[in-house]
Design a protein with these regions (language model features):
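Short, glycine-/small- and polar/acidic-enriched structural segments
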Residues: 1-77, 81-86, 90-98, 113-115, ...
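Short, amphipathic C-terminal "tail helix"
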Residues: 220-224
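Secondary-structure end/capping motifs
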Residues: 137-215
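Predominant activation on well-ordered alpha-helical scaffold segments within soluble catalytic domains
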Residues: 3, 58, 102, 149, ...
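Short helix-capping segments at alpha-helix termini
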Residues: 63-68, 108-109, 172, 213
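Extracytoplasmic/periplasmic, Sec-exported soluble proteins
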Residues: 7, 18, 32, 48-52, ...
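Pocket-lining segment of extracytoplasmic ligand-binding domains
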Residues: 79-170
């Protein structure tokens, strides 16, 4: 989203990373008819957000001889797991591997993810901090990112205690799904939130340009 926002002229730059790997995946039923991405030809795929998810889907399917014209896209309005479990669609793009897989398992269905970064899509940081460079206080942001680093270290070193603290902030968090998702999210946290991988951001920006979602590529100094 940052690349799209920059292309639209929004005054934003990346200042840190919270989740350093993709969470998004293409989700199918483990025991369903889709064993490879080529099996999706002629099938229905659910999505929630037009644009980026279509580009991701196209990038994953095209190496397997499947074009977007070969599938039927259905907007399932963020009802990802129910759409696939009910048979409304054969797969969904935009499923978070730390949530939807657990949600399906709890409800008695096994899901399987095709991971974007293993299917030709450049890896990217899933969750980042952004700020307006004209208004940000550099010293305050440095302290904030340092606090994020210390918090992440504590979370990784103390997963049970950190879950108790996190779930204690809201009663609606205190359920099996969120506890499972918390555990699966732990290895995804950025241990060095201030670190910036220029190549990763440039690679994904090029992917977006080649997909037609942006027309020009920003200088790296305009990204972070």
């Amino acid at each position: 989203q940052l690349h799209l926002q920059i292309a639209e002229g929004l005054p934003l730059v990346r200042i840190g990373t919270l989740v350093a790997t993709p969470l998004n995946c293409l989700l199918v039923l483990e025991e369903g008819p889709v064993k490879t991405l080529a099996d999706l030809k002629g099938r229905k795929i659910g999505f929630s957000v037009a644009g980026v998810e279509e580009a991701l889907l196209s990038g994953m399917l095209s190496p397997h001889g499947v074009d977007l014209d070969d599938i039927e896209l259905i907007n399932v309005n963020f009802s990802l797991s129910p759409a696939i479990m009910s048979g409304q669609v054969d797969a969904v793009i935009g499923a978070f591997r730390n949530f939807e897989l657990n949600q399906m398992d709890i409800e008695g269905e096994k899901g399987r993810c095709f991971f974007l970064e293993e299917e030709g899509i450049p890896a990217y940081d899933e969750l980042i901090y952004v700020a307006n460079p004209a208004r940000m206080n550099i010293e305050q942001l440095r302290r904030f990112i340092k606090a994020t680093e210390l918090a992440t270290q504590y979370i990784i070193n103390n997963p049970e205690k950190s879950w108790d603290i996190f779930s204690g902030t809201a009663k609606e968090l205190q359920n099996e799904l969120n506890e499972r998702a918390w555990i699966d999210t732990l290895p995804r946290f950025a241990l060095r939130p201030a670190a910036f991988d220029k190549g990763r951001y440039l690679d994904f920006q090029s992917f977006l340009k080649n997909s037609g979602l942006i027309t020009t590529e920003a200088d790296i100094s305009d990204i972070a």
